[in-house]
Amino acid sequence: TDGDIDFMSGMISHHAQAIVMARWAEPNGASPSVRTLAARITNAQQDEIALMQNWLKDRALPVPEAKPMPMKMKMDGVDHEMLMPGMLSDAQMQELEAARGRDFDRLFLTYMIQHHRGALTMVETLFGSQGAGQEDLIFKLASDVHTDQVTEIARMERMLAELASAAPPAP
């Protein structure tokens, strides 16, 4: 269905942005716990991107590159670019890329929570679309994305709370 295609295509770009964010953890001096989380996100989402790209290829459908791209929407016959749910703006991405140490940890967790909530919205949109999400592979992928994101949001909220309650390091 169109809903399945939109989900698979959109989630490739969505996951690609999360991977870009996660790859900054080590060079930007993230804490060990944030680095571990970032590595987990990268591994899981790279595998899911490959699965989604193969699903589209198998159906001879256009396969988007695995890079963060805005979604094109037609409104009133005019193309509009907009970010998919939870996607970070260019300004947010620049802010995260420039952050270091504890500031990076705080921004990474805050923005990745926003990003993951957007993925949940995309799953809800898929399952709310007539006839979409019925195929076994798509149902399982979307269900896995939902479960993983809910679990990771809870983990990141705990990590953010711990970061906020910990005393900043002495200068």
Model-derived features: where do they sit?
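All-alpha RGS (Regulator of G-protein Signaling) helical domain and cognate RGS-like helical scaffolds
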Residues: T1-P171
